[in-house]
Amino acid sequence: MEVVDPKIDPWNHPGSQPETPCNNCYCKKCCFHCPLCFMKKGLGISYGRKKRRQRRRTPQGSKIHQDPVPKQPLSQTRGDPTGPEESKKKVESQTETDP
């Protein structure tokens, strides 16, 4: 084991820095380049400032969502409009006529 000069800062020790600089490549080799690359690229963790997304704005001349809602017809009742009692009478009369 090599003797490390105590006067040198730990981050400047020989072998503490990778030989090549970090880059923007996301291949497996570059993801394991150094601990920082592993955190950023391999794990996807970055502690930088988050950029605020701006909303898309519609052009000033457009009239989207400016028209009033059109009147819709009233909902139709489903099934037999005569009511349940009359439909029961029809079923009873049909069962009596069928032998």
Curated annotation (Swiss-Prot):
Post-translational changes noted in the entry: Asymmetrical arginine methylation by host PRMT6 seems to diminish the transactivation capacity of Tat and affects the interaction with host CCNT1. Acetylation by EP300, CREBBP, GCN5L2/GCN5 and PCAF regulates the transactivation activity of Tat. EP300-mediated acetylation of Lys-50 promotes dissociation of Tat from the TAR RNA through the competitive binding to PCAF's bromodomain. In addition, the non-acetylated Tat's N-terminus can also interact with PCAF. PCAF-mediated acetylation of Lys-28 enhances Tat's binding to CCNT1. Lys-50 is deacetylated by SIRT1.
GO terms of molecular function: actinin binding; cyclin binding; metal ion binding; protein domain specific binding; protein serine/threonine phosphatase inhibitor activity; RNA-binding transcription regulator activity; trans-activation response element binding
Region (Core): 38-48
UniProt region (Disordered), positions on chain: 47-99
GO CC list: extracellular region; host cell cytoplasm; host cell nucleolus
Locus of motif Nuclear localization signal, RNA-binding (TAR), and protein transduction: 49-57
Region (Cysteine-rich): 22-37
Cross-referenced Pfam families: Tat
Gene Ontology biological process terms from the UniProt entry: DNA-templated transcription; positive regulation of transcription elongation by RNA polymerase II; positive regulation of viral transcription; symbiont-mediated perturbation of host chromatin organization; symbiont-mediated suppression of host innate immune response; symbiont-mediated suppression of host translation initiation; symbiont-mediated suppression of host type I interferon-mediated signaling pathway
Binding site for Zn(2+) 2: C25, C27, C30
Region described as Transactivation: 1-48
N6-acetyllysine carried by residues: K28, K50, K51
Subcellular location: Host nucleus, Host nucleolus; Host cytoplasm; Secreted
Swiss-Prot/TrEMBL keywords: Acetylation, Activator, AIDS, Apoptosis, Host cytoplasm, Host nucleus, Host-virus interaction, Inhibition of host innate immune response by virus, Inhibition of host interferon signaling pathway by virus, Interferon antiviral system evasion, Isopeptide bond, Metal-binding, Methylation, Modulation of host chromatin by virus, Modulation of host PP1 activity by virus, Phosphoprotein, RNA-binding, Secreted, Transcription, Transcription regulation, Ubl conjugation, Viral immunoevasion, Zinc
Record motif Cell attachment site, residues: 78-80
Chain positions of site Essential for Tat translocation through the endosomal membrane: W11
Crosslink site: Glycyl lysine isopeptide (Lys-Gly) (interchain with G-Cter in ubiquitin): K71
Similarity remark: Belongs to the lentiviruses Tat family.
HAMAP family linked: HIV_TAT
Domain note: The cell attachment site mediates the interaction with ITGAV/ITGB3 and ITGA5/ITGB1 integrins, leading to vascular cell migration and invasion. This interaction also provides endothelial cells with the adhesion signal they require to grow in response to mitogens.
Subunit architecture: Interacts with host CCNT1. Associates with the P-TEFb complex composed at least of Tat, P-TEFb (CDK9 and CCNT1), TAR RNA, RNA Pol II. Recruits the HATs CREBBP, TAF1/TFIID, EP300, PCAF and GCN5L2. Interacts with host KAT5/Tip60; this interaction targets the latter to degradation. Interacts with the host deacetylase SIRT1. Interacts with host capping enzyme RNGTT; this interaction stimulates RNGTT. Binds to host KDR, and to the host integrins ITGAV/ITGB3 and ITGA5/ITGB1. Interacts with host KPNB1/importin beta-1 without previous binding to KPNA1/importin alpha-1. Interacts with EIF2AK2.
Name of protein: Protein Tat
Organism, scientific name: Human immunodeficiency virus type 1 group M subtype F2 (isolate MP255)
Gene designation per UniProt: tat
